[in-house]
Amino acid sequence: MYPLARRILFALDAEKAHHFTLDALNTVYKLGLIPVTDNRTKPIKLMGMDLPNPVGLAAGLDKNGEYIDALGALGFGFLEIGTVTRNPQPGNPQPRLFRVPEHQGIINRMGFNNHGIDAMIRNIEKSKYQGVLGINIGKNAVTPIQNAADDYLICLEKAYAHASYITVNISSPNTKNLRALQGGGELGALLEALKNKQAQLAAAHGKYIPLAVKIAPDLDEAQIEDIARVVKSVEMDGIIATNTTIDKSSLGSHPLAGEQGGLSGFPVREKSNRVLKKLAEHIDGALPIIGVGGIMEGGDAAEKIRLGTTAVQVYSGLIYKGPALVKECLKALAR
């Protein structure tokens, strides 16, 4: 069924197809046509939370939390929505999303287009989803990098009562200078400020919401070691590895190889796994790792678990394989 739908969708502009697919999924869900599936196939603990299974949806698919219920019916163990920012912003000019089917890849330079944290919270409040929900937060493009912490702190405060966990996105290549926050000094200062705010919010709300950070695949070993040292030092609850890559050498002479933006899907798999392996060595079990990047089939999910992750997330693989990828990953992890 999905291969036929994909042929039609791939004939459309990538961003239009994205919205059309999600709207169609929402309609099918509201009509009660998505079969109810038992997603408690491999229960795990992650950052103190009970998950029915370790296969999650990565941030980026549902930026505003408009499709939570429909996505929650696809068998995921957890969902992550966003990236959301303090204020609404349009993102980068279109076209900004490109498929590279010859390489099973996607290039995006979306630029955190979203309706803002307040709109997202309204959508969450309307949702009936009872599962684990992560909120991925970023900074507005107009916010100077030296004031980035202000944006993250406001998003953290607003999201806190509505999230199962919160992810700090400092690794998108599509917001100017954002990746500079991955540097040791900058990273330590930002995460320490967020951990202090987390402690205040936990006391005020009477519940502890875990805090994770999402890193890039374009890191050398010294940078990976530095990040591992910082996240252990400030006692982050989790780390997500990895975001998209700016390295498009794997695309060779493909016409889209010169497009600006982050590359995801199959081409990022090996780079992501290299970072993941080194990160796991340096983290040494101090906090859980969520693996994302290049999961196109069940074996890719199993490989990330073998490299040291507690859970995995998918996104680009869904575009190429459809919802069947979730079951395929769960089957591979059950072996």
Curated annotation (Swiss-Prot):
It comes from the Bacteria. Signal peptide: none annotated. Binds 1 FMN per subunit. Pathway: Pyrimidine metabolism; UMP biosynthesis via de novo pathway; orotate from (S)-dihydroorotate (quinone route): step 1/1. SUPFAM superfamilies: FMN-linked oxidoreductases. GO terms for cellular component: cytoplasm; plasma membrane. FMN binds at residues 59-63, 83, 136, 169, 214, 242, 265, 294, 315-316. Its EC number is 1.3.5.2. Keywords: Cell membrane, Flavoprotein, FMN, Membrane, Oxidoreductase, Pyrimidine biosynthesis. Pfam families: DHO_dh. One of its GO terms (molecular function) is dihydroorotate dehydrogenase (quinone) activity. PROSITE patterns: DHODEHASE_1. Belongs to the dihydroorotate dehydrogenase family. Type 2 subfamily. Catalyzes the conversion of dihydroorotate to orotate with quinone as electron acceptor. This is Dihydroorotate dehydrogenase (quinone). It comes from Neisseria gonorrhoeae (strain ATCC 700825 / FA 1090). The lineage of its organism: Bacteria, Pseudomonadati, Pseudomonadota, Betaproteobacteria, Neisseriales.
